[in-house]
Amino acid sequence: MMTLRLAELAQVLDARLIGGDHEITAVSTDTRTLGKGALFVALRGERFDAHDFCDQALQAGASALLVERELPLAIPQLVVADTLKGLGRLGKLVRERINPKVLAITGSCGKTTVKEMATAILRCEGEVLATAGNFNNEVGVPLTLLRLEPQHRFAVMELGANHPGEIAWTTSLARPDAAIINNVAAAHLEGFGSLEGVFHAKSEIFEGLSEGGIAIVNADNEFWPKWRERGIQCAFSLEDQSQPFHARDIALNGQGCAEFVMVTPQGEVNLTLAIPGRHNVANALAAAAGCLALGASLASVKAGLEQMAPVKGRFCVQRWGSLTLVDDTYNASVESVLAGIDALTAMGGYKVLVFGDMKELGEESAAQHARVGHHAREQGLDAVLTVGEQSRHTADAAAGRHFDNKASLFEVLAQMINTHQEISILVKGARGSRMEDIVKMVVDRQESATC
């Protein structure tokens, strides 16, 4: 992070400065990460108030506090009306000072994969700062911007949301030069009320575009006509070869990875992706469109996409002989599960979906879980094993098997691994379902078998 002074921050934040002026070299909302030179931001939530931990921040070595009321502590304090808004303005200040080219990405699914693809492409051009983990909300976005350093030519920002207005705020901080909506699908319906609500929330990302900024959307999405009515022309598509960014001659190789020709306004390039699934062609098109908008070369697009390594929990493939295990456990929206099933069908041997609950689907939950089961059956999967309250609907629709706990499920899965000479397993579920527990069981079994 660039060095800032408290007196300067007081002006930017319209804050009351209590105590002396000091240099600030780090900003944190977590008392466990504090040290000399750090500003501790005391956030408030429905179930917590970090003002209660400011004495711990002082003991941990913090040099100053950002608070909403003066505290009886011997430490400099910046007093503001809203510490969350104050944190955002700090991130915006650093973004303006460093002034990298910024690519912002949102979508109901695939946004992290697009972020990783774009980061790999832009690293071929220069230093890149990218969103780490799930730092994609109204707290994580400013904390990411605060990590910017003078050497960063680019920033790749993932913007998520679980309520209206959140992306409008974070995009106003990031001020992207290009922004991508990867898709709009049934995810976080509880927070937005309907698919139309998700569309409006994701579309907020374009409100913060810098002057001359480029809006990029998925022309295969049902909301494409509405984006087109708004004058958006930069689109990518797997199905419509009239779009500026599209693919042709798509084929999946023996590892399930796509080989295809990417067509862009800057020319064509032959590509072989390093991660499986036809759906990742669309993700690659989105990433390419965003990076080319920031000035990357087509050569960097090819090099970055072909070098990109799988991300843990994001369609990460492990193989032991004829056993293929796909760990896609980080999260699950309906569309990402359907895409995962499609990718599984291209793999070899006995095909098994191990599935946990999806979350935040509201009244649509039962129907959407059943939709997954119907798709698995239509695609001819050999087995569907489910665990969780809602995934029972998936098992019923797929004529699969439902289990009360993961241990019971794994017993049956282990029998399948023993029985079938070649087997491919996709493990999928929402973050709250912790389906990585099943992945660990399989990995531990295989590693112990090879010892």
Regions found by a protein language model. Name each.
Residues 47, 311, 329-402, 430, ...:
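Active-site beta-alpha connecting loops in nucleotide-dependent enzymes
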Residues 105, 312-314, 432, 437-438, ...:
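ATP-dependent carboxylate/acyl-activation modules
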Residues 17, 77-79, 102, 127-130, ...:
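Conserved beta-strand scaffold positions in the cores of enzyme catalytic domains, especially
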Residues 67-74, 178-325, 349, 374-383, ...:
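Acidic, Mg2+-coordinating active-site environments of NTP-dependent enzymes
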